[in-house]
Structure formats: C-alpha cells, structure tokens
Amino acid sequence: MMTQPNLNIVPFVSVDHMMKLVLRVGVETFLKELAGYVEEDFRRWQNFDKTPRVASHSKEGVIELMPTSDGTLYGFKYVNGHPKNTRDGLQTVTAFGVLADVGSGYPMLLTEMTILTALRTAATSAVAAKHLAPKNARTMAIIGNGAQSEFQALAFKAILGVDKLRLYDLDPQATAKCIRNLQGAGFNIVACKSVEEAVEGADIITTVTADKANATILTDNMVGAGVHINAVGGDCSGKTELHGDILRRSDIFVEYPPQTRIEGEIQQLPEDYPVNELWEVITGRIAGRKDARQITLFDSVGFATEDFSALRYVRDKLKDTGLYEQLDLLADPDEPRDLYGMLLRHEKLLQSESTKPAA
C-alpha cells in the first residue's frame, strides 16, 4: 500500500497515471484482476451500506454520486451521463472517485474514473456472464460500438474466452473504430449492417448504446433460446434498450433492485415484478443458468460497490509504481483545534518570503 508521509497529502491518480498503470499491468490482466475484486465484494454484499445513487437530472443528462462503505473503507464516485456530448466532441461519461478511511474520515486516494469506470463496467458484465451465459459461449454481438465497446469485448475474452464478435452501430464510423482498435487482440470480427444480422448466431448479446431515450434496440423476435443478454446501456430513468416482451421471456438478474427499478430495463415492468440479485447467484444462494434454453438477462446499471472494488484494486496496484502525485488536499495544522492559527502562520511565512532580497 502507498505510504502517506504527511496527513495533508492524498495520492492522486491522473488520467495519464491511470493509462500508464493499465498498460503496465496489461488491459486483459487488469480486467481479470479487477473482476476478481468485483466478485469478492459481491460475495460480501451484506457488509456494505447500500443506497441508490444520488442523481441530479436535466434534459441534457444526469450527474450522480455513488457512495458505499464496508465499515472499514468508504468510497464514492462522481459521474455524469450526457449522451449529447458526443456531438460536441465531449465524452458522454466522465468520472472521478475517492477512497477514504472510515476510522478517521481521511481520504486515502483520489483518482480519475472515466477510464476506470469503463474497465469496471466491463469487468462486472463479464463476472455476471461467467455465472449466467451458456457454457462455452464464444460469440458475442455488441450493439453500440462507442466508448465502452472495446472494454466489453476484451473483458469477455479475458474472463469467458469469447473470440468472435459481431458488431453493429447506427454510425458505421463507430464500428470501424472498434474494429481498428481491436486489431491484433485475437478476435474474429464481423461488421454487420443491422441488429438482426449482428445477433444471428450470438451466444451473448451486449447492448451498450448511449441515447437517453426509451429506445427499442432489441426486439423479441431477435432473441433465440439459450442466449445471455448483457444490457449495459440503461443507467437512468427514461432510458431503455430492450422491448418489454424480451424481459417477460427472460430470467432477469440485477445488481441492486431499488436502483435498477428506477434506471434499468425493468423500469418498463411493474414494481413488484420478480427479479434475481446477482450477489445471490455469485454466493450460490440461487441458481444462475439452469438449462441450455434459458434466456438470461443481466440488467446492468452500475452500482457503487463496483466502483468501491475498482478503487480498492487501484489502491493495491499502485504500490511501488510511483504512478500518482502527492496532492496537498487536506488542511493539517499541528494543533487540530487551531485551523485559523495555521492560516495566520502561513500569512507570516508569505510576508517573510516577500521581504527576502532577490538573489
């Protein structure tokens, strides 16, 4: 673990540091190891404070805070979702996060989480699919080839062995980008001209679109028996990707029902519609995939424990790397009750420095 020589100093992981860390570890290794942390925290689900994320909605998008604690550590993520940003040359999702010590309340880590969120989302999807997808699934359709598509592909390759991709996006340039970025990664890739073509022969269907709308990306006639659906695009009220008939045919698995009923595909269904919780599958309390013809649906919206897992993982991986800055973030007077005195002493220091003769 990193040492903090002064209590005012908090390790800060910039975007540059995060990219260097991911590349040093290796993207697929990073995803596999991160998935291990995610699964570990789902196994101790009962230890966590859980609440739906705190959201501020506007017609342009949403800004959210995602907090949780296991009683020893506290973590939160600030994240936005603004689908229109792509038209303005901006990311649809940006994020940063904090990990803190519950005992003192002092932050232990401040880090970028735009890249890290894409990695943790993909790792979580692959963890769910490990328990829900057909045995020996090798072919995945990805509907929506934007910023998260490559991460999803690489996570499913690293954790499930998926090596055949069928890609579709309304924007052919997005598909071309995805193919270009995954060259040499060990995939057999087919660019498709429609959703119907993309899902043909797929064991797993991933939907990861960005539009903030009740869209119907996938209709019931496109989904055959035995398929696992990884529905990633839903993350706020009023944003869906699947036709309701698909939900009624599927066994639905969610992260945290109170949040998913607001933001996920199941917002289309009655509030008491039965769903299964992913942590119960991972811990063996309930069965995941029961037979070869079962349609399983992971209604993923992202939950705070996954960000907590990602923050823990990054904290642990930073040891001896030097891939962080020492950020002077916290006021730490010698006498904890004398915060104003600290300000006065600094004023004197500035005055003495200003009267020093120039060298």
UniProtKB/Swiss-Prot annotation:
It catalyses: L-ornithine = L-proline + NH4(+). The keyword Lyase applies. Its cofactor is NAD(+). It holds the Pfam family OCD_Mu_crystall. GO terms for biological process: arginine metabolic process; L-proline biosynthetic process. Gene3D superfamilies: NAD(P)-binding Rossmann-like Domain, ornithine cyclodeaminase, domain 1. Pathway: Amino-acid biosynthesis; L-proline biosynthesis; L-proline from L-ornithine: step 1/1. Its EC number is 4.3.1.12. GO terms for molecular function: ornithine cyclodeaminase activity. InterPro entries: NAD(P)-bd_dom_sf, ODC_Mu_crystall, ODC_N. It comes from the Bacteria. The active site is at D235. Keywords: Arginine metabolism, Lyase, NAD. L-ornithine binds at R53, K77, R120, D235, V301. NAD(+) binds at T92, R120, A147, Q148, D169, T209, V232, G233, G234, D235, K239, S300. Catalyzes the conversion of L-ornithine into L-proline with release of ammonia. PANTHER family: KETIMINE REDUCTASE MU-CRYSTALLIN (PTHR13812:SF19). Belongs to the ornithine cyclodeaminase/mu-crystallin family. NCBIfam families: PRK07589.1 (NF005762). This is Ornithine cyclodeaminase. It comes from Brucella abortus biovar 1 (strain 9-941). The lineage of its organism: Bacteria, Pseudomonadati, Pseudomonadota, Alphaproteobacteria, Hyphomicrobiales.
